[in-house]
Regions:
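Conserved beta-strand hairpin/beta-sheet module of binuclear metal-dependent hydrolase folds
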Residues: 1-48, 119-131
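Core dinuclear metal-dependent hydrolase active-site scaffold
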Residues: 7, 18, 97-123, 127-128, ...
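Active-site HxH/HxHxD metal-binding segment of metal-dependent hydrolases
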Residues: 12, 27, 34-109, 126, ...
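Divalent metal-coordination and catalytic microenvironments
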Residues: 19, 31, 56, 68, ...
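Active-site metal-binding loops of divalent metal-dependent hydrolases
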Residues: 32-33, 57, 81-82, 113-114, ...
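Anionic-ligand binding patches
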Residues: 122, 130, 162-173
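Active-site-adjacent loop/tail segments of enzyme domains
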Residues: 138-164
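Accessory terminal helices/loops
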Residues: 155-165, 174-248
Length: 248
């Protein structure tokens, strides 16, 4: 079976994702950051839309739900926290599986950025759609969750196969790279940062990355090494606090 991932930029720094199970022709959209952009891409590709898979309740992830559903008739799926804010037809919980044709999406708990944030892992495609939990060389701010919750979510993602492609929701990588360079002198971090800066100079995306790259260079996954002597979630919290105030 084959899953085609169509990635496109939208809003100021978001990425939209249309994913198509080629065996059935069924298509899903990961989040609805920009309804107009999503509908334009669907029209350009000649695809219909069957499902929306929300990761969390923020408007740049679920704000297009109503317009996209009205235009396509798709089914809206997402975590309970989206309900009451934006339309949802079916509430998903961690541990569930969503089927798109022959492709299975495993629903993973990934709270911390928001309390009920979820991610989607597609074993057959070696892909994870992680919303605002894990970024290339970074992670999401904790608007609602605790450091312990966010650290547990990051460890859950880090347990996926190393070859997993990480599709995050924003192009924040250059900024994240500057912070990584400030806190980690590992040569692998320097090499990756240089590659990121060069890619952005060429106008190229830095997403997706692989989980192996993140485990080797992402300071938030390396927090216990970078802040030794602290419990892992406290080491993570210290780095996240530094990043929140970083102006590099």
């Amino acid at each position: 079976m084959t899953l085609t991932v169509h990635q496109f930029p939208c809003l100021s720094d978001n990425y939209g994702y249309l994913v198509r199970d080629e065996s059935s022709g069924r298509t899903a959209c990961i989040d609805t950051p920009d309804a107009a952009a999503i509908l334009t891409e669907l029209g350009r590709l000649g695809w219909g839309l069957d499902l929306v898979l929300n990761t969390h309740w923020h408007a740049d992830h679920a704000g297009g739900n109503a317009e996209v559903k009205a235009a396509t008739g798709c089914e809206l799926l997402g975590p309970a926290e989206v309900t009451g804010r934006f339309p949802v037809d079916r509430v998903l919980a961690p541990g569930e599986t969503v089927t798109l044709g022959e492709t299975e999406f495993q629903v993973l708990e990934s709270g911390g950025h928001t309390l009920g944030h979820i991610a989607y892992f597609v074993p057959s495609a070696g892909a994870a759609f992680v919303g605002d939990t894990l970024f290339a060389l970074g992670c999401g701010r904790m608007f609602e969750g605790s450091p312990a919750q966010m650290w547990a979510s990051l460890q859950r993602l880090a347990a996926l196969p190393d070859a997993t492609r990480i599709y995050c929701a924003h192009e924040y990588t250059a900024s994240n790279a500057r912070f990584a360079l400030a806190v980690d002198s590992d040569p692998a971090v320097k090499a990756r940062a240089e590659a990121v800066f060069a890619a952005r100079e060429r106008g190229e995306p830095t997403v997706p990355s692989t989980l192996a790259e993140e485990k080797a260079t992402n300071p938030f996954l390396r927090a216990p090494r970078l802040r030794p002597g602290l419990p892992p979630h406290e080491a993570f919290a210290a780095l996240r606090s530094e990043k929140d105030g970083f102006r590099g």
